[in-house]
C-alpha cells in the first residue's frame, strides 16, 4: 500500500519532466493517488506531451489562476474528469516578469508587474484552495513550493518578495482552513535545474552557494527529494502539521557563512 492510497490530488503547473510538479505527480501516482494535472495557454501542448510518460496518463485541465472563470468552474471540471472529492492540492505556480522584476531590476520594477507577481505567485494559493474547497469535504492538504524568503537573494528580487508573501499567505490559510480539517504547508527547495530557474537572470549564482555551504550537499538536477517532501505532506503522515515550511535544501537554511 502507498501512503496516498485512495486519495485524489490536483497538481498544478506541470510543464516539463524536469519540473517539480511532474515528479510530484509521478510519485503521487506510485503511492496510490488518483492525479489530475493542470496548466494553461501555450504550455498546455507541452504538458500534454509530458504526461504521456505517466502511468496512468492523468487528465489535464486548463487552469490560469489569473482568470476568474477558470477558478469558478474548477470544481465542476474536476467532477467531469471523475474527481468528486479532492484530498490534496499542489500549488506549483509562480510568475514574475524576468525582464522587469528580476536580475537586479528591483528598484526599477513597474508597479503593475509587481502586482502581477504577488497576485499570481501568492494570492493564487488562496484562490486555488477556495476553488477546490467545495470538493474537500473530508479535509485535506494544500502544499505549495517556495524558495527561502527570509533573506534577499541576488537576482531573485520581486519574486523573492512574492515568495515571502506566499509564505505568509500559507500561514493565514492554515489559520482559516484548519477548523475544516484542511492543512496548508510549503516546501522550501534549494535551487533546481528547472525551466523556471532558467528564466531567472543570474540564477546560476545560487549553485555556487549551495555547492559550498549545504551540509548534506546539493544536487540541482535531482528534484526527487523535494517532490517526496510534497507527497509526504499530502499524506496522512502529518495530520497535526499546518502553517509549516519544510526545507529541502541540503540544510543550507540552518547554517551561517
List each model region and its residues.
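Short, flexible catalytic-loop segment of classical short-chain dehydrogenase/reductase
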Residues: 184, 188-199
